[in-house]
Swiss-Prot record:
The organism of origin for this protein: Gloeobacter violaceus (strain ATCC 29082 / PCC 7421)
Pfam families for the chain: PapZ_C (PF22740), RapZ-like_N (PF03668)
Positions annotated to bind ATP: 18-25
Protein name as catalogued: Nucleotide-binding protein glr4163
Record-linked HAMAP family: RapZ_like (MF_00636)
InterPro entries: P-loop_NTPase, RapZ-like, RapZ-like_N, RapZ_C
Sorted UniProt keywords: ATP-binding, GTP-binding, Nucleotide-binding
Known function: Displays ATPase and GTPase activities.
Superkingdom, natural source: Bacteria
Amino acid sequence: MTSFSAPGSPVDTVLLTSPAGAGRTEAIRIFEDLGYLCLNHVWPELVPTFLKHYAPIAPRLVLCLASRPEADAQAGLIAARVALRSLARTTVHVHLDCPEGVLLSRYALTRRPHPWFDHGKGLLAAIRAERTALEPVRALADEVVDTGPLELAQLRVHLGALVGGRPTELPVTVMSFGFKRGVPADAQFVLDIRFLPNPYYESALKPLTGLDVGVAEYVFASEQSQATYRSLLEFLRFLLHQYRQDRRSQLLIAIGCTGGQHRSVAFVERLSGDLAAEGFACRPSHRDLAVNRLQELSR
């Protein structure tokens, strides 16, 4: 038997089994996002060979075992467990499953042939044949996950909690930019603060940036700026809590002013600091600041 990890402790290796259509591809993507090297459609008899090559270089490994009509699924799984036990890796066997009606409807939406399909018997017979062959495998699993009622976000939460050991914090970048050089193409949210008082028209502040205290004080001196900031902080606080629960992989929030030197820089610095203080993995970035400085020096 493989050794199931204690609750909350990290899992080195995941043995993943499932009938076709039960969510194997989505599960592999989730494990990849969690930092696992995923090997899909591995024949059980080849597990020792894969482990010999990949175990030394992959501290986190997912072996998704293939089910084939001509193979003994239970014998193959037991052989895979024996190979893993010899390496003393902390392993969990996860079996994905769902009702045959769900599998049938999922295959109705795809053009891919079922691996157990027999032209003389039809799709439902193929689904039933594979699930019957996998019943002994399902019985040996440490965790059986019914993907039928689960949305993708729920499956992500479930599998993440199952393997444990690594927080899935949402990395957030808050970026300043200037509209005159275009909007960042990879931003999920773009906020325009060009309506706020502009330090550019103050001769003493024009050569400075939003990183300078004088510029920041000017930007936030007006009630308009203060109200904007409070509303923006409250909105982002709500937004990040929602995305954190949805287990997004990353988020880029772009805040723009005309040149990306004064107002947006001051806002980004303050926002990223306040959000980081509340526990979000937030960092500031200033896309156009270096370009602006080079242009000033070249004049």
